A protein has these predicted regions:
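N-terminal [4Fe-4S]-dependent radical SAM core
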Residues: 1-68, 79-85
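Conserved AdoMet/S-adenosylmethionine-binding subsite of the radical SAM
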Residues: 74, 78-194
Length: 194
């Protein structure tokens, strides 16, 4: 078996163990750096820039972001295999936007699948479909955020239109085994009656 892919390098800003919200069962979430959207309400603003940053948090300067190999990430992920097996959990990639590091994301998902883990990605879908295709062979669940259906409103609040996101949602639905579309309800943005 060719294990060269385990040396693939990517940039992350966090690994969160024992999550139960982003896929089935108990999961480890790997947060990748970099996102093309600039959502005003972003819960992970430290994820938006791809570069490693010094940020002030709670009055202290903290380095946000680090370069890691797939092997290094999997060493952390595999610590909780008994919990995944018992709960049907596994690995979820989040961000930022994992699709902006497609080779690293695909290699992480491949490593998880080769270790018998359930895999998921939480994503905006704002990337070329070719990036998504790299992940599909190793993906059990695609959790897709669709923030607004109106492109002008979407652009006003995220910095980007949503045509690519909607086109990718259709393609993902046709090509991925399991797609769940989620919409964060944001007051003043998408919380009005239809």
């Amino acid at each position: 078996m060719d294990n060269e892919y385990l040396k693939t390098t990517g940039r992350i800003f966090d690994i969160q163990r024992f999550s139960v919200h982003d896929g089935p069962g108990i999961r480890t979430i790997v947060f990748l750096k970099g996102c093309a959207l600039r959502c005003r309400w972003c819960c992970n603003p430290e994820s938006q820039e791809f570069k490693i940053q010094n940020m002030v948090m709670n009055g202290k300067t903290k380095v946000v972001g680090r370069d890691v190999t797939v092997d290094e990430v999997m060493e952390e992920v595999l610590k909780d295999v008994p919990y995944y097996r018992r709960s049907g959990g596994g690995l979820t990639l989040s961000g930022g936007e994992s699709l902006l590091q497609p080779d690293f994301a695909a290699a992480l998902l491949r490593a998880a699948k080769e270790n018998g883990l359930n895999t998921a990605i939480e994503s905006t879908g704002f990337a070329p479909f070719e990036n998504i295709q790299k992940l599909l062979p190793y993906l059990d669940l695609y959790l897709m955020d669709i923030k607004h259906t109106d492109s002008a409103t979407h652009k006003a609040f995220t910095g980007q239109p949503n045509e690519l996101i909607k086109a990718n949602a259709k393609l993902i639905a046709e090509n991925c085994g399991h797609l769940i579309i989620r919409t964060p309800v944001i007051p003043g943005f998408n919380d009005t009656p239809a």
